Amino acid sequence: MLVSGRRRLLTALLQAQKWPFQPSRDMRLVQFRAPHLVGPHLGLETGNGGGVINLNAFDPTLPKTMTQFLEQGEATLSVARRALAAQLPVLPWSEVTFLAPVTWPDKVVCVGMNYVDHCKEQNVPVPKEPIIFSKFASSIVGPYDEVVLPPQSQEVDWEVELAVVIGKKGKHIKATDAMAHVAGFTVAHDVSARDWLTRRNGKQWLLGKTFDTFCPLGPALVTKDSVADPHNLKICCRVNGEVVQSSNTNQMVFKTEDLIAWVSQFVTFYPGDVILTGTPPGVGVFRKPPVFLKKGDEVQCEIEELGVIINKVV
């Protein structure tokens, strides 16, 4: 109860602040809890600071999880559009606890070395094909949840990333058809244990990327039609208020369409699947000397039009 209360207070406080990048005011789908509701619900985050529209109250036949919502495609999206246009009563921020917009997806696909300026930071060549790895779904937490430092690592680092959420099943998808399989976009924090990436576990990346709480997502799934150009968005990360990463998604080596086409050669995409598209320069490990997260730090990951997620390190 204390944790939920702290999350609701943080939600209310951050909504009162002015952030550098203004979020889209269109379709912003969220998963949330509220004290008077049983279990998670689907909602629409309003862009004017008003709160959250409860989609399940608007139409009780709607599913209560984002994955099930996306599986039904246009039928459920049309209900959400009607709710947005209806100017319904909203739940105030102070009563809402935001969950990750997608929880327990079939897969979380991650991409390494996918920003030109991040490659320059490391003095390495730009990859000729996408570098793919994964996180377990159990690493996903909400946009304002805490990141827990694991005792197994002394080198936990930050990474702000644009996340793509799949809305339509597919395999062997052509790049020209890829955006038809995208539901929308959200902000991700790809928390990374550098010692486990570079010196442990045979230098395989999985364990260092997938500790519990190592994948905060949110605050909303912004539908693709609400984002003018996902490959021209300002992206930044702040640690304790200091800007540590600042770039633009136009620096991505492989764009959303290329990543979907590449990965779908190997696996089937399902609604709710998440693709973390890589991070820009400014991570702690490449600073001189290296800097890593410590207890008490606060990390803010923000992307233009999508919003900001804030995670305290404990």
Swiss-Prot record:
Cofactor binding notes: Requires a divalent metal cation for activity.
Chain segment of the transit peptide: 1-84
Entry binding sites for Mg(2+): 159, 161, 190
Keyword Metal-binding recorded: yes
E.C. numbers: 5.3.2.2
GO-annotated cellular components: mitochondrion
Main location: mitochondrion
UniProt cross-references to Gene3D superfamilies, sorted A to Z: Fumarylacetoacetase-like, C-terminal domain
Recorded GO MF terms: metal ion binding; oxaloacetate tautomerase activity
Coiled-coil residue windows: none
Cofactor dependency: Mg(2+); Mn(2+)
Enzyme class: isomerase
Catalytic activity: oxaloacetate = enol-oxaloacetate
Location(s), subcellular: Mitochondrion
SUPFAM superfamilies: FAH
Function: Tautomerase that converts enol-oxaloacetate, a strong inhibitor of succinate dehydrogenase, to the physiological keto form of oxaloacetate. It is thereby required to maximize aerobic respiration efficiency by preventing succinate dehydrogenase inhibition.
PANTHER family in UniProt: FUMARYLACETOACETATE HYDROLASE DOMAIN-CONTAINING PROTEIN 2A-RELATED (PTHR42796:SF3)
Stated name of the protein: Oxaloacetate tautomerase FAHD2B, mitochondrial
Protein source organism: Homo sapiens
High-level lineage: Eukaryota, Metazoa, Chordata, Craniata, Vertebrata
Gene: FAHD2B
